[in-house]
């Protein structure tokens, strides 16, 4: 009898961790939704197994914004692997091909850019004209959506080009994904045989080299942690990030966070995403 009581006491002693530790990131997300007066979608997924660790509105649609550029470059790399494209191929373009926010491509009107350089510009600097030039090589928005269907993503869709795809109208399914679908697609691109090992390394390196994500999860990342990410921003308060991160400089988990329909400023949106990232990391370290 005494042995049974000791077993029960030991079991009860473990319950507070099981009950109180897990919801902590979700509590942060609920607070963020309240403070933003908007919606948050999030998923934390184990990279190796694909198991969902934390989720909130993970199956609701959110604007992709510039996070689609990771998938776009994944589609480009798939064409490279198939022998239909070369990262060294030079693409020339004109002034009329440039759209708003093209910090890299606008400097190369005279000499053009290679496909690889365009992917680097699209991911590391979120260059919109670079994205459009690449999008043309995969068949436009319809071609990228077809690629998504081919790799098993039946949810994510791209319907328009930069910069119209950032309209983010309430209830509009165009140019949207769900946190769960985006995480699963990113995992396929980086771990399955959809891309060669070389192309997987290249896609990941472009994300590691992201130069416009500083105020988000990177701002709360502990020393020695790995991060590779791509951010996005759009009208009507939309903001987002797709990221791989983990301790010991190793990618272990995928984190996708999307915001929409909030009147908050960009700085406030960045702060809330950083707060959610910090909560996930703190929970991870327990």
From Swiss-Prot:
Record-annotated active site: 66, 164
Regulation of catalytic or functional activity: Inhibited 16-fold better by the beta-lactamase inhibitor clavulanic acid than by tazobactam.
Q: Which InterPro entries match?
A: Beta-lactam/transpept-like (IPR012338), Beta-lactam_cat (IPR045155), Beta-lactam_class-A (IPR000871), Beta-lactam_class-A_AS (IPR023650)
Q: Is Nucleus among the key words of this record?
A: no
Catalytic activity field: a beta-lactam + H2O = a substituted beta-amino acid
Q: Its Enzyme Commission number?
A: 3.5.2.6
| Residues bound to substrate | 230-232
* BP term (GO), one: response to antibiotic
Locate the transmembrane regions by residue number: none
Alphabetized GO MF terms: beta-lactamase activity
Family statement: Belongs to the class-A beta-lactamase family.
Give the protein's function.
Broad spectrum beta-lactamase which hydrolyzes penicillins, as well as cephalosporins except cephamycins. Also hydrolyzes aztreonam, but not imipenem. Confers highly resistance to ceftazidime, cefotaxime, aztreonam and piperacillin.
What is the protein name for this chain? Answer: Beta-lactamase SHV-13
């Amino acid at each position: 009898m005494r042995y049974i009581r000791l077993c029960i006491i030991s079991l009860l002693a473990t319950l507070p961790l099981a009950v109180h530790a897990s919801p902590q990131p979700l509590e942060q997300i609920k607070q963020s939704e309240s403070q933003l007066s908007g919606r948050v979608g999030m998923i934390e997924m184990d990279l190796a197994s694909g198991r969902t660790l934390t989720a909130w509105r993970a199956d609701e649609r959110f604007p992709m914004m510039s996070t689609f550029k990771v998938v776009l470059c994944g589609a480009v790399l798939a064409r490279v692997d198939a022998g239909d494209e070369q990262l060294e191929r030079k693409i020339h373009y004109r002034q009329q091909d440039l759209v708003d926010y093209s910090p890299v491509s606008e400097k190369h009107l005279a000499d053009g850019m290679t496909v690889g350089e365009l992917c680097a510009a699209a991911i590391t600097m979120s260059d919109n004209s670079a994205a459009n030039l690449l999008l043309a090589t995969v068949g436009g928005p319809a071609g990228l959506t077809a690629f998504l269907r081919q790799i098993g993503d039946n949810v994510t869709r791209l319907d328009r080009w930069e910069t119209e795809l950032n309209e983010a109208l309430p209830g509009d399914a165009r140019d949207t994904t769900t946190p769960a679908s985006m995480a699963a697609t990113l995992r396929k691109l980086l771990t399955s045989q959809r891309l060669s090992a070389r192309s997987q390394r290249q896609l990941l390196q472009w994300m590691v080299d992201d130069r416009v994500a500083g105020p988000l999860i990177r701002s709360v990342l502990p020393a020695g942690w790995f991060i590779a990410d791509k951010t996005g921003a759009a009208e009507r308060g939309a903001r987002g990030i797709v990221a791989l991160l983990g301790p010991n400089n190793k990618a272990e988990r995928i984190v996708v966070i999307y915001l929409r329909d909030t009147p908050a400023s960009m700085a406030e949106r960045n702060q809330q995403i950083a707060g959610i990232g910090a909560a996930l990391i703190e929970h991870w370290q327990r």
